[in-house]
């Protein structure tokens, strides 16, 4: 979770001031505004429909979105973002994905021949989005990282597939069938991982309703804080730069991070890499891009350490301290 051990180097020792909150300690309404739900989407409704259902269950007045659309017939891991966390939608949607699905071949094919075809479709492939897709149907390259044959029963073959975001699994299965000369189709599909989030992180719509009802009826926030995660969970895998309170407000206005604003940072940061810019209380300020490597950030007395890719934190949580940052 958020408190997992990181290898951090201290550049300048500072204690957090009175501003902001540790993510798990945000007041409940602010907690919801920075919320992330890893939903186990059921088969049947569309991703949009289950997102709206979550919004209704929580009686949430703000924005609610989902990251990485699943077709109605597909189940599994679907990140849902609330309020301020919707600013992370594009970032979370860009994660690689992992699925388990059934390929039905329309003719008999020897297992060795099928395995050979799966090898052929591992690596960069060309895909054109389906006719019903919401995006422009231009030919694009997507990477298939692995295809594993889990089991076979007659013409039904259970596969585990790890792919780049934006890869159409139904089209992939169809193309494998065409390559084998017998035709093929997808009979079922479940997403078992979206980036760093797996089935183990998932909650159901029923879990969300139970937690919300418990909170509204008894005032007990414990369940709602378990089914809804702080948005910081989405960046737990990223290298981090922790900044002085005096630097926070300028970052929320899109200013680049200067070396003088750094308190501590993850070891091994490379120039050009994506980093999470954090407050001393562990709040995500922005997604940034490192303009120096770790050693340079640690030793430099001046210069710009990171640029801003996407501001996440609202501007009014930390006061401007331009002269002291």
From Swiss-Prot:
Residues 238-313 form the PUA domain. CDD domains: PUA_Cbf5. One of its GO terms (biological process) is snRNA pseudouridine synthesis. InterPro entries: Dyskerin-like, PsdUridine_synth_cat_dom_sf, PsdUridine_synth_N, PUA, PUA-like_sf, PUA_sf, tRNA_PsdUridine_synth_B_fam, TruB_arch. The keyword Mitochondrion does not apply. It comes from the Archaea. GO terms for molecular function: pseudouridine synthase activity; RNA binding; tRNA pseudouridine(55) synthase activity. SUPFAM superfamilies: Pseudouridine synthase, PUA domain-like. It is an enzyme of class 5 (isomerase). It catalyses: uridine(55) in tRNA = pseudouridine(55) in tRNA. Signal peptide: none annotated. The active site is at 71 (nucleophile). It holds the Pfam family DKCLD. Gene3D superfamilies: Pseudouridine synthase, PUA domain. Its EC number is 5.4.99.25. Keywords: Isomerase, tRNA processing. Belongs to the pseudouridine synthase TruB family. Type 2 subfamily. Could be responsible for synthesis of pseudouridine from uracil-55 in the psi GC loop of transfer RNAs. This is Probable tRNA pseudouridine synthase B. It comes from Korarchaeum cryptofilum (strain OPF8).
């Amino acid at each position: 979770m958020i408190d997992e051990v990181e290898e951090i180097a201290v550049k300048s020792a500072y204690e957090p001031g009175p501003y902001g909150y540790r993510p798990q300690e945000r007041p409940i309404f602010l907690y919801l505004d920075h919320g992330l739900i890893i939903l186990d989407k059921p088969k049947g409704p569309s991703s949009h429909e289950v997102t709206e259902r979550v919004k209704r269950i929580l009686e949430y007045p703000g924005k609610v979105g989902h990251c990485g659309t699943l077709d109605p017939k597909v189940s599994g891991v679907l990140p849902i973002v609330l309020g301020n966390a919707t600013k992370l939608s594009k970032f979370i949607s860009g994660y690689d994905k992992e699925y388990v699905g059934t390929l039905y071949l329309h003719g008999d094919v020897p297992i060795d021949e099928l395995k050979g075809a799966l090898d052929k479709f591992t690596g960069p492939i060309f895909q054109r989005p389906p006719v019903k897709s919401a995006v422009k149907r231009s030919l694009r390259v997507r990477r298939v990282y692995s295809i594993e044959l889990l089991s076979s029963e007659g013409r039904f073959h259970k596969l585990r597939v790890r792919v780049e975001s934006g890869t159409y699994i139904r089209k992939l299965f169809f193309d494998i069938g065409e390559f084998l000369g017998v035709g093929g189709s997808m009979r079922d599909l479940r997403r078992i991982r979206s980036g760093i989030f797996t089935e183990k992180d998932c909650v159901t719509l029923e879990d969300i309703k139970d937690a919300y009802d418990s909170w509204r009826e008894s005032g007990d926030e414990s369940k709602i804080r378990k089914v809804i995660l702080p948005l910081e969970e989405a960046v737990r895998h990223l290298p981090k730069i922790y900044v002085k309170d005096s630097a926070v407000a300028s970052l929320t206005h899109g200013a680049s991070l200067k070396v003088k604003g750094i308190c501590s940072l993850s070891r091994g940061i490379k120039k050009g890499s994506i980093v999470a810019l954090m407050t001393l209380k562990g709040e995500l300020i922005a997604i940034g891009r490192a303009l120096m490597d770790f050693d340079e950030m640690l030793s430099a007395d001046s210069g710009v350490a990171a640029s801003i890719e996407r501001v996440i934190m609202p501007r009014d949580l930390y006061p401007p301290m331009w002269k002291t940052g």
